[in-house]
């Protein structure tokens, strides 16, 4: 019975309209940035660009606000940018520690 209800829900116009809208496909396409940032946390910090990390952090913070303010609220986009802001902040801390940390720890 629940399968039948799920099928009727997914066949509804509202459901199709959501999955064919930019409110869905925009965040889906955008998830590549935080996934790449999370994957890069396993790589050496000598390859981190401080300027790009800062730019991506600010970009995600700005668009988190946009995703919250737009009506209807785009929680999928908000989650994407929150994840990216967190991942980029981690990368930024790794960059700072590697480039400006104490020289004794780097040796």
UniProtKB/Swiss-Prot annotation:
It is found in: Mitochondrion inner membrane. It is a multi-pass membrane protein. Its main location: mitochondrion. GO terms for molecular function: pyruvate transmembrane transporter activity. Disruption phenotype: Viable on standard food, but sensitive to a carbohydrate-only diet, with rapid lethality after transfer to a sucrose medium. InterPro entries: MPC. GO terms for cellular component: mitochondrial inner membrane; mitochondrion. Coiled coil: none annotated. It holds the Pfam family MPC. Keywords: Membrane, Mitochondrion, Mitochondrion inner membrane, Transmembrane, Transmembrane helix, Transport. The chain crosses the membrane at residues 18-39, 52-68. One of its GO terms (biological process) is pyruvate metabolic process. It comes from the Eukaryota. Belongs to the mitochondrial pyruvate carrier (MPC) (TC 2.A.105) family. Mediates the uptake of pyruvate into mitochondria. The functional 150 kDa pyruvate import complex is a heteromer of MPC1 and MPC2. This is Mitochondrial pyruvate carrier 1. It comes from Drosophila melanogaster (Fruit fly).
């Amino acid at each position: 019975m629940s399968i039948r209800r799920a099928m009727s829900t997914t066949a509804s116009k509202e459901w199709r309209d959501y999955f064919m809208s930019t409110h869905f496909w925009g965040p889906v396409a955008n998830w590549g940035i935080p996934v790449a940032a999370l994957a890069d946390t396993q790589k050496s910090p000598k390859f981190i660009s401080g300027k790009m990390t800062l730019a991506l952090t600010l970009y995600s913070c700005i668009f988190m606000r946009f995703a919250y303010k737009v009506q209807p609220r785009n929680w999928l986009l908000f989650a994407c940018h929150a994840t990216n802001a967190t991942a980029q902040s981690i990368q930024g801390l790794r960059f700072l520690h590697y480039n400006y940390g104490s020289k004794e720890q780097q040796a």
